[in-house]
Amino acid sequence: MNNKLPSAIGVLFIHLLLSSMIFGQSLTPEEKKIVDAVDAQFPEALSLLERTVNIESPTENLTGVKQVGSLLLPEFNAIGMKTRWIEMPAGMKSAGHLYAETGGSRGKRVLLLGHMDTVLAGEKFRREGDKAFGAGTADMKAGIVVLYFALKALHSAGALDDTRVKVLLTGDEEDTGIPIMTSRASMVEAAKASDLVLSFENGGNNIATVARRGYSDWQLEVTAKTGHSSAIFKESMGSGAIFEAARILNEFYVTLKDEKYLTFNPSIISGGTELTLGDNGSISATGKGNVVPARLIVRGDLRFISEEQKAAARAKMTEIVSKSLPGTASKITFRDEFAAMSPKQSNYELLQQLDKVSQDLGMGKIEPLDPGERGAGDISFVADLIPALDGLGATGGGAHAKGEFVDLKTLTQQTKRAALLIYRLTR
């Protein structure tokens, strides 16, 4: 009988043995209990994900968003947290927010963020191997599941009771209620009473988010002299609204396109002799080929890494707009939506703590995600107040589109990371 293992099997055995030894040395007995609790909870986590995904909750479906909240409130109550629903004024078209908190006095005060609303509706939950499909799976109902079951694992291990943890799940992240000072008042209040904030937007793949770009709307309005097209470019007529808009958009492109982390997208344009503005934000134009266009509107967005970058970009855009072609007049207006989550040193320090957790779990290093790869998010409203880290949710793809999915292998992985990070922060 040959007592030697084949070399490949032997190497694998030694690797597993060493990994087990390292894992055992890195985690305390209580931390091992938390990790074991996460593993044991996977069937429950999958069930909660399915139930939340099967509730259609696009932002404008206020009833659906509230149904998600009604499903989650008793779950947080079951792990000893006090809960309430934060209503928004009726005219804001926002379902409101779910708030939960522990009543302890130990460790850092931790604020956890997520959102219950989605962009699309209609695609029900289905599982195909290690992937779960459905509207809002990745963005971000799986993130809510990670957040909740991280806390439940702490509760199961007796490590949640004396902590100072707040949870805020918004109902309008995908289309923020206006005015923002009202829709995000509870978030700002919670942040001011916290030492740090963690957000559970989709993440995984050994990356986390220390910075997110802000988001702003802009609208360009052009008016011009109108008349028979045979007179265009003459001093008496000028250049028309469409040539003026083309000049402005081209100068935006030439002047701003190469600035790092800055993007601007003219998404809607309509121009002609007359414009009609619809209640739903639509713009329609009429005109004739032999008439110089009198009006034009362009709408778009602006994304930026800091308030300073936003202000500088707006100043350049305003200057470009002011240099009108003959016979035209233009103005540009801006509207704030999401502030930027700038890459502060304190955010990187939180990332280092998550990286230590990940390596202690044997899951590898955590690197910061390039801010250019991520859009705006709720955490940006409070990231200037306290240290902030995002991207703690599960990995997925196809967000805001049919075929959206979450990688179920990362559901447990991310829950373990989040649970141990919260545990260490609250000791």
Spell out what each predicted region is.
Residues 1-7, 162:
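Positively charged n-region of N-terminal signal peptides that target proteins for export
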Residues 10-21:
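Bacterial N-terminal signal peptides
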Residues 25-135, 155-160:
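Acidic/His- and Gly-rich active-site-bordering loop/insert found
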Residues 25-29, 33, 40, 57, ...:
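Metal-dependent amide/peptide-bond hydrolase catalytic core
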Residues 46-50, 69, 73, 148-151, ...:
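Extracytoplasmic/secreted envelope proteins and their assembly/folding machinery
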Residues 140-217, 271-278, 426-427:
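Acidic/histidine-rich catalytic neighborhood of metal-dependent amide-processing enzymes
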